[in-house]
UniProtKB/Swiss-Prot annotation:
GO terms for cellular component: plasma membrane. A lipid is attached at C17 (S-diacylglycerol cysteine). It catalyses: L-threonyl-[protein] + FAD = FMN-L-threonyl-[protein] + AMP + H(+). FAD binds at M31, Y69, A110, L111, D112, D168, K174, I259. This is FAD:protein FMN transferase. Keywords: Cell inner membrane, Cell membrane, FAD, Flavoprotein, Lipoprotein, Magnesium, Membrane, Metal-binding, Palmitate, Signal, Transferase. A lipid is attached at C17 (N-palmitoyl cysteine). Residues 1-16 form the signal peptide. Its EC number is 2.7.1.180. It is a lipid-anchor. It comes from the Bacteria. Belongs to the ApbE family.
Length: 334
């Protein structure tokens, strides 16, 4: 996945129609995309300039810790570390890596944050896009240096048992950034907010009209932007993964930016969009990608077994078809 850069799906924000409360809107660049924050003003809250200064600092810290586009970031330094000796990392990076490992198990290996060399080989990372589709020999060489089983956590350190192991947290760290900002807003006494970074969102409370925040899930169309569903997630985070915008074509074949760890190639299934709800945007972010890799049958089976609210949009000969897990269906009926 092009790190920090491409929002896998656009989620449109909708409001109600009662007399509006005072709403503050903050925005800015981060992680190769943008952030948008809306919150309802309350007595005793710090002024918006003070809040935004701290939000920018927090997001810059996430970049300094986890961006693979910054050669001196904590994660980049670990990737450049070719020894099997433990490498000390921050509590924040450790938290995100731990969740990535947990989600790897939950998705039966479909979410693997060590596929960075394959992502780069296909031209969706810091490396330039290849002039031709990679050969089997090139794929096998990159696959030999991937696998989350080669990554170990001990205390506050990470270690690897193959020197070339490369960790790319782009499938999960953007959601972490949303959580960092949302947690900060709550620490400041803000009870009604929407935090969005590159399409990943966390919500709490009510919007300016005194009704729950409403989110539009985009129809997975390349040519135009339109709405597939409108939901009220409540106090949940929402993340969507899709392959319908970030891809390249060669010789009439479309290659998605989402890589299947088992083949080393871009995914090749009928699922074009996966939306996940969770209390943590980091978790929703990672699950959306992992379930997309798994495909319709396996992905929905995992969603049902673990009571995960999931909406899959699948391409058929007649257009698009929705598949909602049992935990997601109540959100569709609101």
């Amino acid at each position: 996945m092009r790190n920090w850069l491409v929002a896998l799906a656009s989620l449109l924000l909708l409001a109600g129609c009662e007399k509006p409360a005072e709403q503050v809107h903050l925005s800015g660049p981060t992680m190769g995309t943008t952030y948008n924050i809306k919150y309802i003003q309350q007595p005793g809250i710090a002024d918006s300039k003070t809040l935004q200064t701290e939000i920018d600092r927090l997001l810059e810290e996430v970049n300094d810790q986890m961006s693979t586009y910054r050669k001196d970031s904590e994660l980049s330094r670990f990737n450049q570390h070719t020894s099997s000796e433990p490498f000390a990392v921050s509590t924040q990076t450790l938290t995100v890596v731990k969740e990535a490992i947990r989600l790897n198990g939950l998705t039966e290996g479909a979410l693997d944050v060590t596929v960075g060399p394959l992502v780069n080989l296909w031209g969706f990372g810091p490396e330039a896009r290849p002039d031709v589709v990679p050969t089997d020999e090139e794929l096998n060489a990159r696959r030999a240096i991937t696998g989350i089983e080669h990554l170990t956590i001990e205390g506050n350190t990470l270690s690897k048992d193959i020197p070339e192991l490369y960790v790319d947290l782009s499938t999960i760290a953007k959601g972490w950034g949303v959580d960092v900002v949302a947690d900060y807003l709550q620490s400041q006494g803000i009870e009604n907010y929407m935090v969005e970074i590159g399409g990943e969102i966390r919500l709490k409370g009510l919007n300016r009209d005194g009704v729950p925040w409403r989110i539009a899930i985009e129809k997975p169309s390349v040519d135009q932007r339109s709405v597939q569903e409108i939901i009220e997630p409540g106090d949940y985070a929402i993340a969507t993964s899709g392959d319908y915008r970030n891809y390249f074509e060669q010789d009439g074949v479309r290659y998605s930016h989402i890589i299947d760890p088992t083949t080393g190639r871009p995914i090749n299934n009928r699922v074009v969009s996966v939306t996940v709800l969770d209390k943590s945007c980091m978790t929703a972010d990672g699950l959306a990608t992992g379930l997309m890799v798994m495909g319709e049958e396996r992905g929905m089976a995992v969603a049902e077994a673990n009571q995960i609210p999931v909406l899959m949009i699948v391409k058929t000969d007649d257009g698009f078809k929705e598949y909602a897990s049992s935990s997601f269906k109540p959100f569709l009926s609101k």
